[in-house]
Each structure stands twice: as C-alpha cells, then as structure tokens.
C-alpha cells in the first residue's frame, strides 16, 4: 500500500478542516518534530483565537478535564487514517518547553529535548492501550 497523504491535526484546525475528510490511505500526526506539542499549541491559541473559537475547538475534540493532549490523541485515533503517529511529548502531556525543533531558527534548544524513561508512567501506557483498543487499532 502506498501512503499518498499526510496530515497534521493542528494544521487541519487552522484550515477549517476535520478528520472526517481524511482518507484511509493517510498518515495523521497529532504533531511532528517541527511544530509545537499539542499542549503548547493549544495554550498558544489564547493569543490567536476568541474564547468562542476556543470553546468550539474544545467541543469538536470533546475535551474535558482529561487534558487537551488526550483529546487530540483520541480524536486522531478515531479518524479513518490507516496510521496515526503521536509524539511522545503529547503522551507525556508536555508543553512548548519540550518542543523538539523550531524550523528556520538556530537555537541551542533545537533537537535538545530528551525523555527520561521515568517520565512515561504506567497510567499513560494504559491510556494509550485503551484509546488504541477503543478505536479498533489494536
């Protein structure tokens, strides 16, 4: 099977699109190494969107107290895309300070983020397992 398209969830929202329009033969990312973490991205929206637009986004993602990172992961896993890729920073629920790279910049922060294995908790692994099973991706 040839993968012919890739989409980044954060960009879909900027384009006014939804995962409903994603075809099966697609790779869907919550984010990549070149854009902000899901938490960092969502927090940055306070400066870009009205409170009504932010509430609309929360409604689309069915976001509640579980955290925006988990809402974006669940939303992605419900898409028809054959493959969904989630950066570990999103699983860990980390913010902009854990961003991997900022394209077009020269910074000591680029490519310097490292994960300590103790950061990945059993509860996070169980949550990913549950999301995977609920989306019939197991």
Where are these regions (language model features)?
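Carbohydrate-interacting/catalytic domains
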Residues: 7-16, 22-23, 36-138
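Conserved phosphate-binding loops in nucleotide/dinucleotide-binding enzymes
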Residues: 28-30, 115
